Amino acid sequence: QACQEAGVDAFGGPDRAHDSFTNIQKAINYSMTSFFTTGGIRGQKQSMEKFHPRSFNMGFSQEVLKATGGFSGLRFGEDIDMSIRIMAAGFKTCLLPEAYVFHKRRTSFRKFFKQVYNSGMARINLYLLHPHSLKLVHFLPACFVIGCLLCLLGGIFFSWYCLLPLLLLIFVFFIDSWRLNKSIKVAFLSIV
């Protein structure tokens, strides 16, 4: 029904954190959905990349299923692979902001870091399957880590002024998370 109403063949919606989620889950949700941390690629109205529905909240027509053969056997990144194949087959996708789901996140930072690692491996596999799918936005996490390391090294070996960009980012993440989650504790956890 959503496909017919929106005039598209596949759709997806954003994910949200339910009030009952733990503070760590809310902080992880912030890191996975904030425009500042993901470029808006995970279900935001403003995005640096064309919207790709994710399997946690994806719907598609029977024609899409027949044309694509459904999900591939990938262990990680199978949802992005499906979205790429949907678009490559000429079908249209859209974000339905009102079709949100409460996406329960990992319960510890250790489990979250493992998930992020697996997502990075999935991006490599997706590039091998679909070389055209690699976009500038996918390099931002690596650039962020390198930038943080350079700021820290500059602060240690040159001047504390080198830490200012890092401190500014921490401040922006903290304020944005506090604004969205209305919790100082979640805001502190969001900068971990």
PLM features: what roles do these ranges have?
Residues 66, 84, 146:
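A cross-family signal for key residues in well-ordered alpha-helices
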Residues 72-134:
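Catalytic donor/gating beta->alpha subdomain of glycosyltransferases that bind UDP-sugars
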Residues 28-32, 112-114:
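Short, hinge-like loop/turn segments at secondary-structure boundaries
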Residues 1-26, 30, 92, 98-104:
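Conserved donor NDP-sugar-binding/catalytic core segment of glycosyltransferases
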Residues 122, 132-138, 144, 148:
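Anionic, Ser/Thr-rich low-complexity intrinsically disordered regions
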Residues 17, 38-66, 75, 81, ...:
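A recurrent flexible, glycine/aromatic-enriched loop bordering the glycosyltransferase active site
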Residues 144-192:
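Membrane-embedded multi-pass helical conduit in multi-pass membrane proteins
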